[in-house]
Every structure is written in C-alpha cells, then in structure tokens.
Amino acid sequence: MSQDVNELSKQPTPDKAEDNAFFPSPYSLSQYTAPKTDFDGVEHKGAYKDGKWKVLMIAAEERYVLLENGKMFSTGNHPVEMLLPLHHLMEAGFDVDVATLSGYPVKLELWAMPTEDEAVISTYNKLKEKLKQPKKLADVIKNELGPDSDYLSVFIPGGHAAVVGISESEDVQQTLDWALDNDRFIVTLCHGPAALLSAGLNREKSPLEGYSVCVFPDSLDEGANIEIGYLPGRLKWLVADLLTKQGLKVVNDDMTGRTLKDRKLLTGDSPLASNELGKLAVNEMLNAIQNK
C-alpha cells in the first residue's frame, strides 16, 4: 500500500557522504519531481545538417552548497533542466561539449531524474561519458573560443549547484564576454542565471545590465523550499536579488514554466521551463544560421 503524500516527512534527508549535509525531504521530492516531464516531441528533428555549430555546456562540478546555518545542501545540476533542453538541441543536429571549471566530473541531482521519460534518459545515456570526463573551461577558452569558434551557444543548466563557484569565476566571465562580443547565444534557467553574475566581476557595471531574465524565484528559496524541507536552511545569497543589483531585470516572481528571449540571452524560470526553453533555443539558433 502506497504511503499517503501527507504522511511523508518534511525533514531533509541526511547525506551520509558528508558532515551535516542533506538531500531534500521525501515530501518535497513528492511535490517537485515526477517520473515524466512535459516533453511533447521535437519540432525540428535533424534540421541542422552541416555539422559545424555546437553547444558549449558549463556544468556544475561541486555537489555541496554551504548554507547560513552551517548545514550543507547536497545538490548538483538538475537533470531535467540540463537534459531536456539538450535533447531538443541534439535531436535538431547540434553536438554538445561539456565543460566544468576544473574539468572534474559533473554532479547531478539524480533524485530528480524522471526515470520513465525516454527523452531525458536517452540524452543522459548519450552524454554520460562527457559528463564524467568534461573539458576544463580554461582549456576551452584557450583553444576553442574566438571569432571563428564552432560554438553557437553557451548553455548553463540550473540546480542549486549553479550558485557554487560559477558566479565568481573569471573563466565563466571570459566565456560570457566572448558570447556577447561574438553574437552567440547564452541559454540558462532556474538557478543557472547565477552564472550571469560573473559578467560583472571586478567591473563598475555588468555588460548584461538592462537585460531581462527569468530566474528561480527568491521567495521560494526563502520560504516554501525551507518549509517543506527541500533546503535544510537559508542560502547565503539569492540569485534574483544579486542579478537585480547588477542592473538586470527579473521579470518573474513565481514558477510557471516561463521562458524569455532578450537579444541572444534565452532564460527560463525553473524545471517547468525546460521543454519550452529547448524549443526556443533550437528555433533561435536555426534562425541565426539561416541569417548568417
């Protein structure tokens, strides 16, 4: 007999691999995860056939987020936020390269994996080797960026691990500078827009000042996520708050699956935006290729 959802614990689940670290509570996972996504098919299967243009994904290599109360949240990149947009891109014909800050393996929130979703699972299996042996971002910058680079877009998936290191990385800053200077796309969602904070490092103002973005609502990280035991405490800083202080305009204060295009910056508000963000990225990239 299945357990009633209201009987599930709202206490975060201890992660025995680390001191004072916790996974989300059973109750929160019942609310935030599902065996399938809203994937409803690929719109442009095989539409890109030339083979030149690729996607550079900057993924998280750190699992633990240290919180205000000294506890750690055991996290990673959210599998739906990573793999569903990539499914649309790969099925359209774009290859994907994976990079992390140090070249260490990508960390995923496997507890959020939709185990009955063929689109997500098949993409995970195709990328598994690259996720375990990613490129070092500094090497990508040195050897593969420039005006003639084969990367048409930079993709930064979410999951709370995106708030660790990536927002303070000079390598991420250089990558975003390159994308902006060379008219390439920046695609990100949920907590992934924390990476955009790096654009303002050691500068009087961010080159992204004035851009509009969707991002995971601070109000949920400050409220419901703690109340239902998804987070074991408060984050030390909030993504939307700091983006706003850098002059970006956060257009949402809720989680509805909203996506947004502002010039070459494509954003989504949460895992609920993964499917539509993937479609948006494919459409925009194909249009850009046609107009080159």
Swiss-Prot record:
The protein's predominant localisation is cytoplasm
Q: Which GO terms describe its cellular component?
A: cytoplasm
Catalytic activities: N(omega)-(1-hydroxy-2-oxopropyl)-L-arginyl-[protein] + H2O = lactate + L-arginyl-[protein] + H(+); N(6)-(1-hydroxy-2-oxopropyl)-L-lysyl-[protein] + H2O = lactate + L-lysyl-[protein] + H(+); S-(1-hydroxy-2-oxopropyl)-L-cysteinyl-[protein] + H2O = lactate + L-cysteinyl-[protein] + H(+); N(omega)-(1-hydroxy-2-oxoethyl)-L-arginyl-[protein] + H2O = L-arginyl-[protein] + glycolate + H(+)
State the Gene Ontology terms under molecular function: glyoxalase III activity; protein deglycase activity; thiolester hydrolase activity
Supply the EC number(s): 3.1.2.-, 3.5.1.-, 3.5.1.124
Leading EC class: hydrolase
Record-linked Gene3D superfamilies = 3.40.50.880
Q: Output compositional bias ranges, type Polar residues.
A: 1-12
- Residues covered by region (Disordered): 1-23
UniProt keyword annotations, A-Z: Cytoplasm, DNA damage, DNA repair, Hydrolase, Stress response
The active site is formed by 190
Q: Name one GO biological process term.
A: DNA repair
Q: Which InterPro entries match?
A: Class_I_gatase-like (IPR029062), DJ-1/PfpI (IPR002818), HchA (IPR017283), Prot/Nucl_acid_deglycase (IPR050325)
**What compartments host this protein?**
Cytoplasm
- Pfam families assigned to the protein according to its UniProt record, in alphabetical order: DJ-1_PfpI
Its family remark reads:
Belongs to the peptidase C56 family. HchA subfamily.
Its biological purpose is as follows: Protein and nucleotide deglycase that catalyzes the deglycation of the Maillard adducts formed between amino groups of proteins or nucleotides and reactive carbonyl groups of glyoxals. Thus, functions as a protein deglycase that repairs methylglyoxal- and glyoxal-glycated proteins, and releases repaired proteins and lactate or glycolate, respectively. Deglycates cysteine, arginine and lysine residues in proteins, and thus reactivates these proteins by reversing glycation by glyoxals.
Q: Which HAMAP family match?
A: Deglycase_HchA
Query: Any idea what this protein is called?
Result: Protein/nucleic acid deglycase HchA
